[in-house]
C-alpha cells in the first residue's frame, strides 16, 4: 500500500497536538513549546499547509509546509511516528510531498536528532528530480544545519 497525504483540518488540532508532543520532545528537548498552542498556530496560519502522512487510513506521521514568498517552501516539520519508522515510509513520504510541490525548498535540521540528520542526508542525496542541493547554516539555535534545493516539476528537463 502506498502512502498518501491528507490535509490536517483545524478540527483535528487535538490530534496534531498529540502527535507533536513526542516529536517536539525529540527535536527540541530543551525548548518549552506547548504542543497544543503550536498545533493551533500551525493550523490557523494562512501561509502554512499541514498534512497527515497516511498508510491506508492510519496516520503514521505529519508534515508542516511553510509557504514562503516567491513561490518557495520550507519543510518546517516532518515526522514519521516512532512506531512506524525504519520501514522506508519516511523516504516515500518525503518523495510524495516534494513531488506534489515542485520548486525551491529549504529545511533546517534539529541538532538534537542525529537520526533526522542522517535520514535527510541520505534521503535528499537519493531524491529523484532534486537539483542544486546545498547545505547551509541553521535557521535557529535549535538546528545544526540547513538544506536548500529545487525539485523539478513534471515538465522540467
Give names to the regions the model predicted.
Residues 1-34:
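Short amphipathic alpha-helix that is part of the acyltransferase structural core
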Residues 106-121, 125, 135-144:
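Conserved beta-strand-loop-alpha-helix junction that forms the acyl-donor binding cleft
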Residues 54-56, 149-152:
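Active-site beta-strand termini and strand-to-loop segments that position acidic
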